């Protein structure tokens, strides 16, 4: 074989590729066509195609076993056409054994490369082709899990996603595969987070952590601690979240497996995103922006499209909370382009909603309101609820700008009821603050009504350790009282809140607070 290959290279019938870690040889198109004709004439084409499919099935199976828990494998984009050809041939021949085993082995490759639409196609075909011998086995477990991931990211949070994850988890529990139990419980956590049901999501995060403890794998324990931290942030338990996330991210590897990408989900990236948001809420705006930027850099380095998309989305979220709309817009544009390129349909509406928020900030109230309505409709259709509270709050602010006060109050009240029901509490102080400001602007509303709601916002922010939202509520209270000449107490309260910050003094909120304090000699 070596001599034959060398002879073909010498005759320029084969090209050599030295760009990767392994030297690769490729027949020229004319040579390939000639060889295929000879193969067909010999009657051995079917035999060679079967060997080709089996060889890639075995290669992928071996690499998946070697990379188990490491989030990496050697086979990559340069071999994807071979894998596709093998799958096409296997299913065309109705060779159920080869087709389903190859699809199961290829699933991690499709997920690693974020070829989600393709992954969905092959997993659906393979599950339909499973016979009774493979139902309830490791093979079906892998196929169902990968089907759920590809469905969730391309089609939204349908019941079929929950069914696929649930079936895979049932098999993992039946065969005693703790690693897969951790990963599937983590994916069910993400599924419920995306639905906006944060209380049910938290239950699954705790279950994932319990399964990781049973594994005794330090990396999985750290990863699921990060998952719990992310959930605590969304539940408004920011101090606990900050501790969990900080501890989880201290783990850098060593004994056990890396807390990297499994079944298309990047534990570490998700924890860093959540840490950035939690840092902002707890009053560490400068650190939040730095961590968000680092998360985007890390995600770009992994070359994992779904992970980069999430990093861009949440880095933009941090910048939006910090009112740094210029830099946020740059991330949003990159996020939308990335989501389109990789068919991540449920994310596109989030990007459009964030662009609408920037339009509101720039004074384009009607355009912003119209786009937010479309974004919210699309998000609800895809059952992607993680940004509904924030967008509904912005919609209410836009309606207030247009003088549509009754609809603004109805919008914010409806969203607060939903958020309370499902535990979407991290933005509740901001929703209360915006409602208070709407009431303060609303003709015929007594000042004490607005003040009572703003006080609720302040007290809830305090209970959540959300210092940044506490500052906003204190500023709104001071402004409201200044309208009727009784702002002194609330200005002193604002000074007290301002004095607890140790960084972020250049942010718009902090500059506004400083100007208010300077105006009364308390700066």
Describe the residue ranges of each PLM region.
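C-terminal boundary/linker of central alpha/beta nucleotide-binding cores
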Residues: 1-42, 46-54, 92-107, 120, ...
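Start-of-helix signal in alpha-solenoid helical-repeat scaffolds, especially tetratricopeptide repeats
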Residues: 25, 29, 53, 76-80, ...
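Inter-repeat boundary and helix-capping residues of tandem alpha-helical solenoids
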Residues: 45-49, 72, 76-79, 92, ...
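Specific register positions within alpha-helical solenoid repeats of the TPR/Sel1-like families, i.e.
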Residues: 60-64, 111, 152, 193, ...
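Short, well-ordered secondary-structure microsegments
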Residues: 63, 71-133, 141-151, 182-184, ...
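Short coil/turn linking the two alpha-helices of tandem helical-hairpin repeats
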Residues: 63-64, 107-110, 134, 148-155, ...
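Extended non-membrane alpha-helical scaffolds
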Residues: 152-169, 173-426
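C-terminal non-catalytic interaction modules
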Residues: 160, 410, 414-417, 421-523
């Amino acid at each position: 074989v070596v001599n034959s290959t060398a002879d073909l290279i010498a005759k320029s019938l084969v090209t050599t590729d030295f760009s990767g870690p392994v030297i690769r040889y490729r027949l020229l198109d004319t040579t390939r066509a000639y060889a295929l004709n000879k193969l067909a004439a010999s009657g051995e084409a079917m035999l060679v195609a079967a060997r080709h499919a089996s060889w890639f099935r075995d290669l992928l199976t071996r690499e998946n076993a070697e990379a188990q828990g490491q989030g990496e494998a050697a086979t990559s984009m340069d071999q994807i056409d071979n894998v596709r050809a093998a799958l096409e041939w296997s299913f065309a021949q109705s060779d159920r054994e080869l087709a389903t085993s190859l699809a199961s082995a290829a699933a991690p490759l499709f997920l690693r490369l974020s070829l989600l639409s393709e992954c969905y196609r092959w997993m659906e075909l393979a599950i339909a082709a499973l016979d009774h011998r493979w139902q309830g086995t490791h093979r079906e477990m892998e196929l169902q899990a990968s089907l759920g991931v590809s469905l969730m990211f391309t089609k939204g949070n349908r019941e079929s996603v929950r069914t696929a994850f649930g079936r895979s988890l049932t098999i993992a529990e039946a065969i005693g595969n703790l690693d897969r139990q951790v990963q599937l419980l983590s994916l069910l956590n993400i599924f419920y987070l995306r639905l906006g049901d944060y209380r049910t999501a938290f239950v699954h995060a705790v279950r994932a952590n319990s399964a990781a403890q049973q594994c005794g794998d330090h990396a999985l324990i750290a990863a699921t601690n990060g998952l719990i931290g992310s959930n605590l942030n969304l539940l408004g338990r920011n101090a606990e979240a900050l501790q969990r996330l900080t501890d989880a991210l201290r783990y850098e590897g060593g004994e056990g497996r890396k807390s990297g990408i499994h079944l298309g989900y990047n534990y570490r990236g998700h924890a860093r995103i959540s840490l950035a948001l939690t840092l902002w809420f707890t009053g560490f705006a400068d650190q939040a922006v730095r961590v968000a930027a680092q998360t985007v850099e890390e995600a770009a380095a992994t070359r994992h499209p779904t992970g980069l998309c999430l990093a861009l989305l949440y880095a933009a979220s941090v910048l939006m909370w910090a009112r740094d709309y210029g830099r946020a817009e740059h991330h949003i544009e990159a996020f939308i382009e990335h989501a389109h390129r990789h068919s991540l349909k449920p994310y596109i509406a989030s990007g459009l909603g964030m662009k609408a928020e920037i339009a509101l900030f720039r004074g384009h109230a009607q355009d912003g309101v119209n786009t937010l309505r479309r974004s919210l409709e699309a998000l609800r259709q895809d059952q992607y609820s993680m940004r509904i509270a924030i967008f509904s709050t912005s919609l209410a602010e836009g309606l207030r700008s247009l003088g549509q006060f009754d609809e603004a109050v109805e919008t914010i009240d409806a969203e607060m009821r939903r958020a309370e029901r499902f535990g979407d509490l991290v933005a509740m102080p901001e929703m209360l603050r915006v409602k208070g400001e709407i009431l303060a602007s609303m003709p015929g509303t007594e000042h004490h009504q607005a003040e009572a709601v703003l006080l609720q916002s302040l007290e809830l922010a305090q209970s959540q350790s959300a210092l940044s939202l506490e500052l906003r509520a204190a500023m709104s209270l001071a402004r409201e009282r200044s309208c009727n000449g009784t702002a002194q107490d609330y200005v002193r309260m604002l000074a007290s809140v301002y004095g607890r910050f140790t960084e972020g003094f250049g942010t718009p909120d902090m500059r506004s607070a400083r100007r208010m304090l300077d105006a009364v000699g308390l700066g």
